[in-house]
Amino acid sequence: MGKGVGRDKYEPAAVSEHGDKKSKKAKKERDMDELKKEVSMDDHKLSLDELHRKYGTDLSRGLTPARAAEILARDGPNALTPPPTTPEWVKFCRQLFGGFSMLLWIGAILCFLAYGIRSATEEEPPNDDLYLGVVLSAVVIITGCFSYYQEAKSSKIMESFKNMVPQQALVIRNGEKMSINAEDVVVGDLVEVKGGDRIPADLRIISANGCKVDNSSLTGESEPQTRSPDFTNENPLETRNIAFFSTNCVEGTARGIVVYTGDRTVMGRIATLASGLEGGQTPIAEEIEHFIHLITGVAVFLGVSFFILSLILEYTWLEAVIFLIGIIVANVPEGLLATVTVCLTLTAKRMARKNCLVKNLEAVETLGSTSTICSDKTGTLTQNRMTVAHMWFDNQIHEADTTENQSGVSFDKTSATWFALSRIAGLCNRAVFQANQENLPILKRAVAGDASESALLKCIEVCCGSVMEMREKYTKIVEIPFNSTNKYQLSIHKNPNASEPKHLLVMKGAPERILDRCSSILLHGKEQPLDEELKDAFQNAYLELGGLGERVLGFCHLLLPDEQFPEGFQFDTDEVNFPVDNLCFVGLISMIDPPRAAVPDAVGKCRSAGIKVIMVTGDHPITAKAIAKGVGIISEGNETVEDIAARLNIPVNQVNPRDAKACVVHGSDLKDMTSEELDDILRYHTEIVFARTSPQQKLIIVEGCQRQGAIVAVTGDGVNDSPALKKADIGVAMGIVGSDVSKQAADMILLDDNFASIVTGVEEGRLIFDNLKKSIAYTLTSNIPEITPFLIFIIANIPLPLGTVTILCIDLGTDMVPAISLAYEQAESDIMKRQPRNPKTDKLVNERLISMAYGQIGMIQALGGFFTYFVILAENGFLPFHLLGIRETWDDRWINDVEDSYGQQWTYEQRKIVEFTCHTAFFVSIVVVQWADLVICKTRRNSVFQQGMKNKILIFGLFEETALAAFLSYCPGMGAALRMYPLKPTWWFCAFPYSLLIFVYDEVRKLIIRRRPGGWVEKETYY
C-alpha cells in the first residue's frame, strides 16, 4: 500500500446534493471492513534501494525542507482525527426523553390536556390533573439529571489517544538533525529515536544499535522486542524492521524512514476502529423498552375499552375523553423510573467495593446475562510477573513455588549442584532491586532489569538469601552481555572460595547453545563427562519444560585454572582470551508468568454458571495452552486435535475436529478462516484458546460469538484491545496496567486487574436482574387498586373511591422505599449454578409477571380497598346499593339535600368530607395490603420462611410506609393541603384479612411450584 493508495482509502466519500445517507452508511461499513482486515504493508520487504526509490528519500541526508512541506500539505498533519463526539446537551436530552421517561412525559401532557378541557368547560375545575402533570414532569427531570450525572464521567476515548501522541521528533532534513513538532513529520522523513522516546510515526528501520521497543500497548506482548533493519517475518506486526507509531523505545538507538503518518498508522487504524464501532443497546435497555411496550399496551387497551363503554353509558364526549386520559395516567407507574435507576446505582456502588468500577449504569446488569467471556491472558489470568517454575539438575526436574504468597511446594536445596546453579543464576545476572524496599516482601519488590532476570533474582533471593552479598563476595571482572547472535551472557568473577581456583566463569543462555559449549556435566556436585545418555536426558527435560509453555534457560560454569589465569590477569572481551567452550553444564531453570491464585476457582464458577471462557492472547500457543490448562479453561481430560493425534500417533489432518472438545487456534490460521469456519469452531468446541492474535482478530472473535447469540464480555488492557472492548456487550478494562484508551472504551474497570473480580460482577449482575423483577412486580401490583376505583366510578356511577392525589402519595410516597429495599434482597439459591438467561425468552417483565401482579394479587388488593370504602360509607348512612347511580347528584355543588339510606340530608361540603375520608381509607388499605405484597415479593420460588427476614432495609421500608400513611392521615392541615382526613383506628383493620389472604395464597402457590417443578402452576405463574 503506497502513499497514494493509503491516502485515497481515507478520502471522504463525495456525497450528492441530496445527502445520500445510504451511501454514507455503506461507506462506513466498507471502511469498518477495511479496518478489520489485517495490517497490509510491504515496506518491510523492500531493500534500502527500493525504499529510496519509493519515498524519494536520501538515506543519509533525508528529505529537503521544501519536499517535506509539499508532502505535509498533501497528507495533512501527523495526528489522529478526533471522532465526532456527542454534544453534552444531546446526552442530557437522551436521559430526559429516552425509554421510560417518554411514557411519563406522555402521561404529563395528557394531564395538562385534561386540565385544559376541564378549565374550558367547568366554572371551578378541580386542580388534580394540573398537580399530577407537574409532579410527573418533576419526576422525569429529577431522575434524568440523576442518570446524566452518573454517566457524565464516561466516553472520552480520543482524549487518551491524544496523550499518547509524542510531542517532539528528531528528523534529519538536508543532512541536518532538527527537532520538530511530531505533527509535522511526513511520509519519507528520516527519523532518529533513542531509548525513552516515543516512536513518532510508523517507521521502517534502516539502521539500529541495540534497539528494543515496548509493543505491549499494541500487540499485548510483554517482553521488549528487538528492532533491526532485517526483514524477519511476512507479518508486518511480527517483523523486526518496523517500529510503530506511539509505542516506546526502551533502549538503544535506531534510524528509520516514515512509511505512514496519522490515521494511516497501525495505531491510527485501531483508533478509528474503536471510535467507529457502534456499541449497540444494552440488554437491560432492551428489557425496559419491552416493558414499556407491555405497560403502554395495557393502558391504551383499558383506556379505549372504557372510553367506548362510557359513550355507551351515555356520558358526554368530553367526560369520556377525560376518563380515557385518567385511566391511561393511572396505569403509568410513576415511581418505577426512579426505582430502577436507584437499584442500578446501588449495585454499581456495591460492585465498586468489590473492585469492579462500572462506568455505565446499565452495564451492571449486562454482566449478569453474560454467556461468553473472552479474556486476555497476561495480567488478567496470570500474575504478570515472570516467576521461576521448574529447575532441572542432578538429572531430575524440581518444581519451584509459583504461588503469590509462597505457600506452595519446595524442593531439596541441599545438593551441591543446586549451590552451583544458584550461584550462576545470581552472578550472571544484571537485574538489581530498586532502592529502599527492604521492608517489602521479596516478591513484591520492584526490580530494574528484564523479566527473566528479575525472576531469577527473586528466586535466588528467596531460596539462598541476599544476592547483593553474593555479588560483593564474587567481584565481577568482565562480562559479555547477551546479544541475539551468540545467544548467551557471560561474566568472570573473583572466586573467594579457597578450595577452588581464583577465577570463576559463569554463563547462561538458550539451552541448546549452552549445551553445545559444554563437554562435562555436574551431577551431585561431581563433574562427569557429557555422554549421549545424559544429552538425551537433557533433551527430554528441555522438551517437557518447553511443552509446559515455560521459557527455559541453560546454565554452565568453568573454574579457570590458576596456572593460565593468575590473579590480576587482564581478560579481554573483544579479542576473547579465555575459554568459552568445554565448559561444565550445571542445569536448566524455566520460568512462566503463573496463573493468579483465585483464577482457577473463578473459571470453575463460570463453568457451573454456564459461561464459556475463551482465552485470547498475543502469546505463543504452547504457553497459552499451558496457562489455559493451569487455570481450567481447558479442563482435565479434554483433548485438542493435536493431543488426539499424538495419542493415536496419526497426522493431525486425519483427526475429526469434532472429536476434540478443546482447541487452540493460531492467529495465522484465523487470518485465513471464513466466518462460517470460525462459527463452527465456536459452536462445536466448548473450550477454546486463541493464540498469537492481533487486535483486529480479537474484534472478529467477539463478533463471531455475538453471531451465535452470545452476550459477550471482553477483558483487555492494551490499546490493541479497545475495538473489541467497544464492540463487546460489556468491555472490561484493567485498572492497574490498563492503558487509558482501553479504560475509555470499556464499560467496566477491574481495579485489581483480577479475573476473579469479573465473576463477582457476574453474580451481582444476576442478582440485580432478579431483584429488579421483584421490585417491578411489587410496584405494578398497586396499579390495580389504583385503577379499579376509577373504572367502577364510571360503570356503576358511584362517588369516586380514590383520588388522583392519593394515587401519587402511593406511587411516589409509600411505595418508593419498599420497592428500592428489594434491591438489597439476598439471592434465593445459588445463582451461579444456573445457565445465563436467554435474552430472547427470559424477559425482565413477562406476561406471567403482569398476570400475577394485575390479575391475581392486584385484584385481592382492590377488593380490600373497596371493602373499606363500603364500610365507611355504610357507617355514615350510605348503604352499598343506595350508592349506585348517585354520582351525578353527589358531585353537583348546587344540590345540598342528598338523602342517604336513612333519610338524612347531606350538603355538598359534608358529602365531600366523607368522600375524601374514603379516599384516605382506600389509600391506607392499599398500604396494608402492600405489606403482604412486599413480603411475598422477597422470593420467586422459595418460601419466605426459608429466605428469612434478614433484609434490614426492607423491614425499615415496612415501617416507613406505615408511618408515612399515618402522617398523611393524621397530620393537622392535611385536609386543606392534600384533602386527606383522619380515620377511625378500626378502619385500618378492614384490609387486614385481605393482606393475610395475599400472603397465604402466594405461599401455597410457591409450595406447588417447588413440589411440582415444570408443572402447570409454574408455567402460568412463575415470573
Swiss-Prot record:
Consequence of changing residue 303 to R: Results in altered sodium and potassium transport
Modified residues annotated as N6-succinyllysine in this record: 661
Record field: transmembrane: 88-108, 132-152, 289-308, 321-338, 773-792, 803-823, 844-866, 919-938, 952-970, 986-1006
Residue numbers bearing the Phosphoserine modification: 16, 23, 40, 47, 228, 452, 484, 668, 675, 943
List of catalytic residues: 376 (4-aspartylphosphate intermediate)
Residues bound to ATP: 487
Region called Phosphoinositide-3 kinase binding, residue ranges: 82-84
Predominant subcellular localization, coarse grouping: membrane
Binding site for Mg(2+): 717, 721
GO process annotations (BP): cardiac muscle contraction; cellular response to mechanical stimulus; cellular response to steroid hormone stimulus; energy coupled proton transmembrane transport, against electrochemical gradient; establishment or maintenance of transmembrane electrochemical gradient; heart contraction; intracellular potassium ion homeostasis; intracellular sodium ion homeostasis
Protein EC: 7.2.2.13
Molecular functions (GO terms): ADP binding; ankyrin binding; ATP binding; ATP hydrolysis activity; ATPase binding; P-type potassium transmembrane transporter activity; P-type sodium:potassium-exchanging transporter activity; phosphatase activity
Extracellular side: 109-131, 309-320, 793-802, 867-918, 971-985
Effect of substituting residue 314 to K: Abolishes targeting to the basolateral plasma membrane
Keyword Ubl conjugation appears in the UniProt entry: no
Result of altering residue 302 to R: Results in altered sodium and potassium transport
Top enzyme category: translocase
PANTHER family, A to Z: SODIUM/POTASSIUM-TRANSPORTING ATPASE SUBUNIT ALPHA (PTHR43294), SODIUM_POTASSIUM-TRANSPORTING ATPASE SUBUNIT ALPHA-1 (PTHR43294:SF9)
Function text: This is the catalytic component of the active enzyme, which catalyzes the hydrolysis of ATP coupled with the exchange of sodium and potassium ions across the plasma membrane. This action creates the electrochemical gradient of sodium and potassium ions, providing the energy for active transport of various nutrients. Could also be part of an osmosensory signaling pathway that senses body-fluid sodium levels and controls salt intake behavior as well as voluntary water intake to regulate sodium homeostasis.
Record-given protein name: Sodium/potassium-transporting ATPase subunit alpha-1
Chain's gene name: Atp1a1
